[in-house]
Amino acid sequence: VGWGWKETADAGLDIVSYTGNGSNPRNISHNLSAIPHWILIMDRDQGVDRFNYHQAIGNTHTLLLNATNPKIDSDVWNDTTPTSSVFTLGTNDVNANNVKYMAYVWTEKKGFSKFGSYKGNGNIDGPMIYTGFRPAWIMIRNTGATENWVLFDAKRDVFNEMSAILRADSAAAEGNQPDSYAIDFLSNGFKIREDDGKINSSNVEYVFMCFAESPFVNSNGLPVNAR
């Protein structure tokens, strides 16, 4: 299965290409006209670590999309929260001289996308997370332990409980263990149905990125028409 995102401020995505200059801190402009909630930066020349800013873990930490490390205390974001016009780089990990980078910059759009967090309860009756829409695609990450990034979508798994996962940090084939990491896609969010560490360890913070299949409300907060 393939996924794609169209760059448009209306959908909350700006793609920014820049060349590092080795001078930190450095501000990089974006065109969202809104505060970013998720930023992914990739080195286009060397293909090394892929750094994530997520609003739930803040500007003092990062997560690596290509690795299973827990969140890292880092100066990558210069301990500076992004604004509606710029995000700030703090180290040569994302601003090495003459290295080309690509930054994917997202902001939440009501009824279309949600970038949040939840706390696991270690129970098969796990937390329910409100998004305001039925998900089409969800990526979840345990921030406090060595675990995979796990992706669920409504194309490979069409009925609840959903347990077919791909791992963003691994080239391994699809996993499917309904007794370990199942979730339900709901009309207004998703519910955790198992207690595996990838999605639901007790008292652990998880971050998620979620995009809509069917909005529960439109961008103005009004209920949408039934299909």
Question: Could you describe each region identified by the protein language model?
Answer:
Residues 1-227:
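Surface-exposed molecular-recognition determinants
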